[in-house]
Amino acid sequence: MGKLNSDTNRVYTVMHKSLKCDADEAKQWIKDRSAKLTFEGKEEKLMSFEWYLNNDETEATLIESFEDSDGLKQRFENLMAGPIVPEWSERFELKYMMVFGNVKKDVIELVTPFGATFHTFAGGFNHR
């Protein structure tokens, strides 16, 4: 069980996007390409990678969690070096990206050009 108001090294990202393609194509791409390639990448510090669509399926949100800032750095570097970004750009328009947790300066510099905003821990708990 976690401790109350005890910060962890965990880092979370929320990327909200609008769809540029139809919902069926987006869902198929999410399952067959994005989730599959990320899962197969076996990034040790990536804890979760979950896509969601809004009720009318015009917007998508990707939520990721990492053990620490280094996990986000590895994820981002792998993403930029892989085949997914051009495919992603054809299907989605990034509306905003939020990063939560204690993020190292080099990672902030890496992610900021993509419009990320950064949020530090203020209080709460995590039982996992």
Functional labels for PLM-detected ranges:
Residues 1-60, 67-78, 90-128:
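Short S/T/G/P-rich N-terminal loop/turn motif that feeds into the first structured element of a domain
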Residues 80-87:
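A short, acidic, amphipathic alpha-helical segment used as a generic capping/interface helix at domain edges
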